[in-house]
């Protein structure tokens, strides 16, 4: 997962100089927490253990909608896509883009718990950028050596802030290990993408960054004992790599099936192919991996350099729909990628596959 949040100069905003008391009215009851100066309401609530609704945590999805009932707040990114249809005159805000100026009362139209049932409570850490390497012409992977170990579930993400760069980026972990002292992330370069441009430059190696997480609920748990369907576009493959690593550690594919569909434009745009081929071998026939090419017709049904990786032509959700016909029994589906791709995959999973919402876990990023 990768998504972008923008922020104005914090020094110019009328922020509180000390912790503010925040009260949140939800369908589950009223909860309270303290918010530090300059901290977003979402991050403050999450690090106190509240299961506030969120997806991207960076302003693009609109899931963390809340209404300010009393008190004064500062909105960091007025033009955030996630707030495009909000009733601003009624006090609607994105928790991930809003900071308290003083004590305030919010209303969140969702069920909220005081502590996550399965996931770790997120926290702030610092980290050092290491092992930056190009995977393709426009995709880079990198590691962040963390100031304190992090427990996370496969499929989760963190938000990263870099020195001197406006805003924050959300990235799904590629690796999986408990009490991780480093995390591996991947980013696809985009036009006017400040963080991506910085990574492709010469100054990122060894730089100090700020990390908040883990976040996200599109997670894998081996004890659910389900077949796995994974559909990813571009850098959305990151979380699927973590799921594969966790599944391999649990020997999940000894008794369960896995189907991975990875969408890229052309054969040359594929990455992690050697890792896929190795996972296929380890699964001994219980894992299928297909590289879907949206702008190129493959010369054959299999990758020429990576045995075990199948090739297909078309949009990844369409390729998955054709390949999965009649094979949706007893599975959980994971989807990650740009919103149009995710929406297309969700339609396929619900209308063709007959899956219930509880059997689908997804991340959208812009």
Curated annotation (Swiss-Prot):
The keyword Iron-sulfur applies. Residues 122-221 form the FAD-binding FR-type domain. One of its GO terms (molecular function) is metal ion binding. MSAMO is inhibited by metal chelators (such as bathophenanthroline, bathocuprione, neocuprione, alpha-alpha-dipyridil and sodium EDTA) and by sodium azide, sodium arsenate and potassium cyanide. Its cofactor is FAD. It is an enzyme of class 1 (oxidoreductase). SUPFAM superfamilies: 2Fe-2S ferredoxin-like (SSF54292), Ferredoxin reductase-like, C-terminal NADP-linked domain (SSF52343), Riboflavin synthase domain-like (SSF63380). PROSITE patterns: 2FE2S_FER_1 (PS00197), 2FE2S_FER_2 (PS51085), FAD_FR (PS51384). The MSA monooxygenase system consists of 4 proteins: the 2 subunits of the hydroxylase component (MsmA and MsmB), a ferredoxin (MsmC) and a ferredoxin reductase (MsmD). This is Putative methanesulfonate monooxygenase ferredoxin reductase subunit. It comes from Methylosulfonomonas methylovora. The lineage of its organism: Bacteria, Pseudomonadati, Pseudomonadota, Alphaproteobacteria, Hyphomicrobiales. The gene is msmD.
